[in-house]
Amino acid sequence: DEVLITKAEHASNVLPWLELEKEIGIVVKYIPLDSNHKVTIENVENSITENTKVISLAYVTNVIGDVRPIKEISKLIHENNGLMIVDGAQSVPHMKTDVIEDDIDFLAFSAHKMLGPTGVGVLYGKEKYLENLKPIYYGGGMNSRFESNKEVEYKSLPLRLEAGTRNIAGVLGFREAINYLNEIGIENIHKHEIELKNYLLTKLKNIKEIEIYNPLTESGIVVFNIKNIFAEDTSRYLNHYHICVRAGNHCTKMVKDEIGVKNTCRISLYLYNTKEEIDKLIEVLENNHDLYDIIL
């Protein structure tokens, strides 16, 4: 059985499949990306074989920032009697993500990417597939009864899959975060992010020392470097001026094969960011005469 992913996936959507390849002998294959580092329907079609059982992709990648055509990809894998699994960590907080419209079989996303607490996440699955899932751990709360004769009766979904004491405080915090985002409106959040992204790219492109690795990003994610400067040093420099960016490989260690660089600085725009903050970033990047004084 084959599982299709890409080299732009987060570790959370790579390592579990690689472990299953070792344990039970599945075959992990990579869908090639095009010259813009994006997934195309043509490349998906060419990657599917009679042995393909799963396509597992991020809806929005956390480095390239592209929005995948999940609805069309889902149609292709279902025609092959396979499953569509989606990493929604970068889509659910930022844009409308419709599991029914896109015919997604499983969708996973986390609270801390959408103003919620850490240690909490969501797994959506079609009920017919959840019914067949084996719990990954066992304990109190998941069973209706168990007897000395070793008979066990488990509860119905979702309790059957949730043993022990849940992260109650985390779940309640996540609920409030969702309510807050819904009050603002996911469409309004997405519109705001795209406006900021376009504004940011226009400004960054005017700085000759800046190299942008995803100029065609379709989300609020922009990755860049100051030429000939380590990403971590750029991050330290910006931090001196109270500007926070992420520096490193962003848990996508294979994407270097696509963009040609191991570490980058990543800007992840969200509902709380402003054009004034972008202006401050641009000002610091343009007037970087003190860069070496700060990082050395």
Labelled PLM ranges:
Residues 1-296:
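Pyridoxal 5′-phosphate
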